[in-house]
C-alpha cells in the first residue's frame, strides 16, 4: 500500500475582534515572529505535500508578512465558521491524501503531538488532538459513550452536565481527503452562532460507524490559542520561559533570566554572559567569550569573539569584530562594520561606517557615512557633518590619523594617513599630506567685564 501524502490546512480567517486591533490577529508578534509564522513552521515540520492557508479579506496585510511562495491561498470572504473555511480549502486538496487541520492562532502544537496523530490515523478514519484540562471553559467538549467518541459539543451549545467534561478538543485533526469532503458537505448552521462548525464532522463520521480516535497532546499548553492581548501575553511568557531554559541548557549565562528577552534567533559560541534587561531581536550571532551589559538592545547583528558590549548600548544591523569594547551608552546603527580591537565609548553614535583595526572613538562623537582606517584615534566631541539637507556625503580617514577633541569634519572630505587634526578644528578641505591641521582662532580677553546680574521681579519678592 502506498504511503499517503499529507496536506496541511491552516485556518487563519478569523476577524480577531477581541484583540482590539486594526490588523489581523494572526499577524501579532510572539517571540519576534507573527503567530501565523509559528504555525506555518509547525506545518512545514511534517514535510507536507501542500500547505493551504485560509485567510480573510485582509489579503494585502497577511501576504505582505507571509511571503512563502509554497503556500496555496484560499479566501473566506464571509466568516461562516470553521466548517465553511475547510470546505473552501477542500478545492485545493486531493481525495487520496490525508489532511491535517491547524489553527492560525495556536502556535504551540508540537511536532511530537502531530506525529502521534499520524500514528493514530493508521488505525482510524479520523483522529482528534485533545487534552484533559482542569478548567475546560471555552473549549469544545469530547462527548464519549462507553469510550467511543460520539461528537464534539461546542461550549456555547453544551448543557450543564456536558460542560463538566474535562477532555477538550484542540481543533486539530487528521482525516482522509475524500472522507473529509463528504462530512463537510453534510454540516449545517443550526446552532446558537449560526455558523458551520468543523466539529460537526465528528457527528457525521460517527453516523457512518467510522473509527474515531482521540490523541492527547504531550503538554496541555499546546492547545492554548490567542483571542485577546491578555492571552497573547500569557503565550509570550511561556515562549520566553522556554527560550530562556533552552539558552541556559546550551551554556549561556543569564544573570537575570526573568528579565531577558529574545525576539528572534540566537546562535552562540561558548562563555556567553548576558546581564539583566538585555533585549535581542532578529537574527543574532555571538562568538565565544562575549559579555553583554545591563539594558543593551541588539538587533540582527554579528559579534565576534572576546568582545564586550557595555551597559545600555544599542546595536542594529551591525558586524563587530574580535576583542572590541562597545559602550556604555553607545549607538551603532545599520550598515556599520567594525574590525577587530575597536573601542567605541560612551555617547558615541556611528551609522553606515566601516572602521578598521585598533581604532578608537571613545567619547561623545557622531560618525556617519565614514571609512576610518586602522589605529585612528578620535577625540571627544568630534562629528562628521555628512548631510546638506538633501544628500549624504562620505568622510574617509586614513590609517594612524589623530583627531583632536571638538572637531568638525565637513563632508565630503578625505584625510590621508598619519595626519593630525588639532582640537577645535573645523575641516572643510581634504588633507593630502601627513601634517598638522588647525584653525587660527585668536583668543581675546575683555578686561573689566562683569557677569550680568539677575533681574529681581516683583513676583520673586
Curated annotation (Swiss-Prot):
Pathway(s) annotated for this protein in UniProt: Nucleotide-sugar biosynthesis; UDP-N-acetyl-alpha-D-glucosamine biosynthesis; N-acetyl-alpha-D-glucosamine 1-phosphate from alpha-D-glucosamine 6-phosphate (route II): step 2/2; Nucleotide-sugar biosynthesis; UDP-N-acetyl-alpha-D-glucosamine biosynthesis; UDP-N-acetyl-alpha-D-glucosamine from N-acetyl-alpha-D-glucosamine 1-phosphate: step 1/1; Bacterial outer membrane biogenesis; LPS lipid A biosynthesis
Region annotation N-acetyltransferase: where it falls in the sequence: 251-461
Gene3D superfamilies named in the record: Hexapeptide repeat proteins, Spore Coat Polysaccharide Biosynthesis Protein SpsA, Chain A
Keywords assigned by UniProt, alphabetized: Acyltransferase, Cell shape, Cell wall biogenesis/degradation, Cytoplasm, Magnesium, Metal-binding, Multifunctional enzyme, Nucleotidyltransferase, Peptidoglycan synthesis, Repeat, Transferase
Residues binding UDP-N-acetyl-alpha-D-glucosamine, per UniProt: 11-14, 25, 76, 81-82, 103-105, 140, 154, 227, 333, 351, 366, 377
Reactions listed under catalytic activity: alpha-D-glucosamine 1-phosphate + acetyl-CoA = N-acetyl-alpha-D-glucosamine 1-phosphate + CoA + H(+); N-acetyl-alpha-D-glucosamine 1-phosphate + UTP + H(+) = UDP-N-acetyl-alpha-D-glucosamine + diphosphate
Cellular location(s): Cytoplasm
Listed cofactors: Mg(2+)
Main localization of the protein described in the UniProt heading: cytoplasm
Pfam families: Hexapep, NTP_transf_3
GO cellular component: cytoplasm; membrane
Active-site residue list: 363
EC numbers for this chain: 2.7.7.23, 2.3.1.157
Membrane-spanning segments: none
GO BP field: cell morphogenesis; cell wall organization; lipid A biosynthetic process; peptidoglycan biosynthetic process; regulation of cell shape; UDP-N-acetylglucosamine biosynthetic process
Any GO MF annotation of the entry: UDP-N-acetylglucosamine diphosphorylase activity
Oligomer and partners: Homotrimer.
Name of the protein: Bifunctional protein GlmU
Annotated organism of origin: Buchnera aphidicola subsp. Schizaphis graminum (strain Sg)
Lineage of source species: Bacteria, Pseudomonadati, Pseudomonadota, Gammaproteobacteria, Enterobacterales
Amino acid at each position: 500500500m502506498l504511503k499517503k501524502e499529507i496536506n496541511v490546512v491552516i485556518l487563519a480567517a478569523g476577524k480577531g475582534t477581541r484583540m482590539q486591533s486594526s490588523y489581523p490577529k494572526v499577524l501579532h508578534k510572539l517571540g519576534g515572529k507573527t503567530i501565523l509564522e509559528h504555525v506555518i513552521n509547525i506545518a512545514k515540520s511534517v514535510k507536507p505535500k501542500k500547505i493551504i492557508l485560509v485567510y480573510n479579506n485582509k489579503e494585502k496585510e497577511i501576504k505582505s508578512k507571509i511571503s512563502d511562495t509554497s503556500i496555496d491561498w484560499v479566501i473566506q470572504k464571509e466568516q461562516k465558521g470553521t466548517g465553511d473555511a475547510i470546505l473552501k480549502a477542500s478545492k485545493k486538496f486531493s481525495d487520496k491524501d490525508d489532511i491535517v487541520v491547524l489553527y492560525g492562532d495556536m502556535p504551540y502544537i508540537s511536532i511530537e503531538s502531530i506525529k502521534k496523530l499520524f500514528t493514530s490515523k493508521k488505525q482510524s478514519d479520523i483522529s482528534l488532538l485533545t487534552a484533559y484540562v482542569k478548567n475546560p471553559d471555552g473549549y469544545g467538549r469530547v462527548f464519549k459513550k462507553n469510550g467511543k467518541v460520539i461528537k464534539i459539543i461546542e461550549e456555547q451549545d453544551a448543557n450543564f452536565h456536558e460542560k463538566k467534561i474535562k477532555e477538550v478538543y484542540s481543533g486539530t485533526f487528521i482525516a482522509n481527503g475524500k472522507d473529509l469532503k463528504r462530512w463537510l458537505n453534510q454540516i449545517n448552521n443550526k446552532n446558537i452562532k449560526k455558523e458551520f462548525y468543523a466539529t460537526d464532522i465528528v457527528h457525521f463520521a460517527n453516523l457512518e460507524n467510522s473509527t474515531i480516535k482521540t490523541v492527547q497532546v504531550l503538554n496541555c499548553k499546546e492547545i492554548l490559542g490567542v483571542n485577546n492581548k491578555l492571552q497573547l501575553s500569557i503565550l509570550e511568557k511561556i515562549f520566553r520561559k522556554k527560550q530562556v531554559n533552552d539558552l541556559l541548557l546550551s551554556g549561556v549565562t543569564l544573570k537575570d533570566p526573568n528579565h531577558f528577552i529574545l525576539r528572534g534567533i540566537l546562535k552562540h559560541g561558548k562563555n556567553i554572559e548576558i546581564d539583566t534587561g538585555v533585549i535581542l531581536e532578529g537574527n543574532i550571532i555571538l562568538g565565544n567569550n562575549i559579555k553583554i551589559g545591563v539594558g543593551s538592545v541588539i538587533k540582527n547583528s554579528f559579534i565576534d569573539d572576546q568582545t564586550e558590549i557595555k551597559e545600555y548600548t544599542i546595536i542594529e544591523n551591525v558586524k563587530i569584530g574580535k576583542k572590541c569594547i562597545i559602550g556604555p551608552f553607545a549607538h551603532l546603527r545599520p550598515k556599520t562594520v567594525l574590525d577587530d580591537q575597536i573601542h567605541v565609548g560612551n555617547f558615541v553614535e556611528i551609522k553606515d561606517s566601516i572602521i578598521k583595526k585598533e581604532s578608537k572613538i571613545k567619547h561623545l562623537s557622531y560618525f556617519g557615512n565614514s571609512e576610518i582606517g586602522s589605529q585612528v584615534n578620535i577625540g571627544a566631541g568630534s562629528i562628521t557633518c555628512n548631510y546638506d539637507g538633501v544628500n549624504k556625503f562620505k568622510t574617509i580617514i586614513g590609517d594612524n590619523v589623530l583627531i583632536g577633541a571638538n572637531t568638525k569634519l565637513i563632508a565630503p572630505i578625505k584625510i590621508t594617513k598619519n595626519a593630525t587634526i588639532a582640537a577645535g578644528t573645523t575641516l572643510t578641505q581634504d588633507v593630502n599630506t601627513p601634517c598638522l591641521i588647525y584653525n587660527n582662532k585668536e583668543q581675546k580677553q575683555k578686561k573689566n567685564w562683569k557677569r550680568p546680574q539677575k533681574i529681581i521681579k516683583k513676583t520673586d519678592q
